[in-house]
Amino acid sequence: MNTADQARVGPADDGPAPSGEEEGEGGGEAGGKEPAADAAPGPSAAFRLMVTRREPAVKLQYAVSGLEPLAWSEDHRVSVSTARSIAVLELICDVHNPGQDLVIHRTSVPAPLNSCLLKVGSKTEVAECKEKFAASKDPTVSQTFMLDRVFNPEGKALPPMRGFKYTSWSPMGCDANGRCLLAALTMDNRLTIQANLNRLQWVQLVDLTEIYGERLYETSYRLSKNEAPEGNLGDFAEFQRRHSMQTPVRMEWSGICTTQQVKHNNECRDVGSVLLAVLFENGNIAVWQFQLPFVGKESISSCNTIESGITSPSVLFWWEYEHNNRKMSGLIVGSAFGPIKILPVNLKAVKGYFTLRQPVILWKEMDQLPVHSIKCVPLYHPYQKCSCSLVVAARGSYVFWCLLLISKAGLNVHNSHVTGLHSLPIVSMTADKQNGTVYTCSSDGKVRQLIPIFTDVALKFEHQLIKLSDVFGSVRTHGIAVSPCGAYLAIITTEGMINGLHPVNKNYQVQFVTLKTFEEAAAQLLESSVQNLFKQVDLIDLVRWKILKDKHIPQFLQEALEKKIESSGVTYFWRFKLFLLRILYQSMQKTPSEALWKPTHEDSKILLVDSPGMGNADDEQQEEGTSSKQVVKQGLQERSKEGDVEEPTDDSLPTTGDAGGREPMEEKLLEIQGKIEAVEMHLTREHMKRVLGEVYLHTWITENTSIPTRGLCNFLMSDEEYDDRTARVLIGHISKKMNKQTFPEHCSLCKEILPFTDRKQAVCSNGHIWLRCFLTYQSCQSLIYRRCLLHDSIARHPAPEDPDWIKRLLQSPCPFCDSPVF
């Protein structure tokens, strides 16, 4: 791997003068402004940011498209909107890969081949109206109709409208595999929901544009019965209105909420649901409600339309606020003319949600500064001792911010602008949901980091300048996105000006830089409230990179982790320990890729001269062995000149081939392997206890389930050194329930009994081998089964006859790495 480029950011790097702010604050739901204390944010030496480049840079096949072409999902997938497809880059922290580069799994969502025609009437009526408008003698009608690509997506003589305008990721846990869904909006206004169910192919689950058009057609293009009857489609104003009310501008997902569903026996059960808000050109907002897991059109629960009253809407975002265990939600809508406000959303049958009584105006001035992007981050106010919401919006080259918190007086609104950040308009903005840090970028390759600092009244921002030219050279930026835990920043770049000249061709790339140090990532993992390795892939990838470079686990991390294991015993810390040991084991493996595959020029001549062979075979073997040693030696010398080979440490592999150096390394590898097996066995036993607990809670006396209960009990008690009181008590209760019944598994080929002697596989007396499901420990006696993302374990598919509690077990992540199972 090439040596990483680093750029230290501090006050000396800051070009513009310290920025000033204009601030106002308001009280109550009306959100009126009052004068407040001045805030003068600027660069500070207390917030130094070390930016490090990560390889590889991912080249894109097509030019990027849309206003915000980059989005990073909660399950660590980056979507890039391009002119022909959506490139999806999945960040994988592969414990089986000794390379130091990022491991990225790349897939693609192709754009539809046929153009999207919005349904504004019957086909014959629409065709007649189009001919009429195209041949109209009124130039205001004919020219407007011919030049509007919403009316003419095919383009006639113009190229078709292909590519994507915007993408939005759902929260984690929405598809059949418990991962994120992708809402995609094409340039010709087709809104679809895509899912990646088998990791290699994306599937379109539903076309919301088509469904919404059919609903409008059935209601005669009226949102309520009180509206006036529909006009004549032959009227050009009515033709425009019908298109405008179903032309999507942006769409955003809400968080997962819980609804109650009534069964046939009048029992209520909690069902997960998610909302998708779609902003249309005329200012209306369609709020779709989907049942989870979302599988298609049958998962649509409802669709309600809200009139925002905002002219020329440009962007929206969900506002979700929690105060004293009471949740409130709304939609933040921004206009191309400048105003921003929060609209109430009435969530019917949603547990624990409350609604605003009236809209809250965050910014009402029609200052002609278009709202390009909006983000909302929940924070905790250290002075007010309550939760609050930070809303930030990119408006031209400025950042508008608004702090909302609920007090006894009502909803308090503090708002202001941060100026002096960029000399060019902001093209992209992203926010770290962990700490509220905001990142903005302009097209000249400059990125700003804004850190919110609370004051007794409201807040101020400390900001740092990140010059990408110090990291990548001269580049232009087109979009940025921060990873879920704030460890990485993804950036779309093209070549910048060289010697005052623009490049002839644009090569679009997705680059990655680090935003945290190894120490910060390790501390965040140890103190994490999530306690799931898969949800923190960006953090553990930083840890992986550090261990692979240094070939040892830092002492402070080992000691802190052992203290966590001793004090809590939570399996999350055991999985973290297993991850560290596996990476350490990979760092000890010798990778002869550069030394052996690349023969030198002299060696090739020797092989050509000696190829006829003069002498015995032993001499030939000796010469070949000598030449191979020369290749290894010269390859290592070349690498040391290039700076790729680091100084050998105590844990690194010896470069010589003597037996004396090999034996300690083999002993160290065997020692690490033994620790890995011990941690894996501990995690296996803990998961077995969980499975047996589910069996005890959900079975009657002597009930036969698909889970090998007796085998699990015998396996846990077979080790005399394993003394777990919880396991012994649980096994005693289960043994009483089973009443001496064994219910053994049988081989499907020869009907022999499958003994439970191995946690990974089952072998019958005739030698038939079946792999075991690591979620239920049943033998997978079929050719089709699921596997976790890192290939740690396998799992069987749920069967129709499985009870609900077994299906819930089969939906669990991998017990070793927390990865989802496909």
From Swiss-Prot:
Gene Ontology MF term list: DNA binding; histone H3K14 acetyltransferase activity; RNA polymerase III general transcription initiation factor activity
KW DNA-binding (keyword) present: yes
Catalytic activity annotation: L-lysyl-[protein] + acetyl-CoA = N(6)-acetyl-L-lysyl-[protein] + CoA + H(+)
Domain of life: Eukaryota
EC number, UniProt record: 2.3.1.48
Keyword set, alphabetical order: Acetylation, Acyltransferase, DNA-binding, Isopeptide bond, Nucleus, Phosphoprotein, Transcription, Transferase, Ubl conjugation
UniProt keyword annotation of Transferase present: yes
Biological process, per Gene Ontology: 5S class rRNA transcription by RNA polymerase III; transcription by RNA polymerase III; transcription initiation at RNA polymerase III promoter; tRNA transcription by RNA polymerase III
GO cellular component terms listed in the entry, alphabetical order: mitochondrion; nucleoplasm; transcription factor TFIIIC complex
Site of covalent link Glycyl lysine isopeptide (Lys-Gly) (interchain with G-Cter in SUMO2): K225, K629
Positions bearing N-acetylmethionine: M1
Main localization, broad class: nucleus
Protein location: Nucleus
Positions of modified residues (Phosphoserine): S19, S604, S611, S652
Pfam families, per the entry: DUF5921, TFIIIC_delta, zf-TFIIIC
Family, similarity comment: Belongs to the TFIIIC subunit 4 family.
Quaternary assembly: Part of the TFIIIC subcomplex TFIIIC2, consisting of six subunits, GTF3C1, GTF3C2, GTF3C3, GTF3C4, GTF3C5 and GTF3C6. Interacts with BRF1, GTF3C1, GTF3C2, GTF3C5, GTF3C6, POLR3C and POLR3F.
The protein's role, per its UniProt record: Essential for RNA polymerase III to make a number of small nuclear and cytoplasmic RNAs, including 5S RNA, tRNA, and adenovirus-associated (VA) RNA of both cellular and viral origin. Has histone acetyltransferase activity (HAT) with unique specificity for free and nucleosomal H3. May cooperate with GTF3C5 in facilitating the recruitment of TFIIIB and RNA polymerase through direct interactions with BRF1, POLR3C and POLR3F. May be localized close to the A box.
Name of this chain's protein: General transcription factor 3C polypeptide 4
Source organism per UniProt: Homo sapiens (Human)
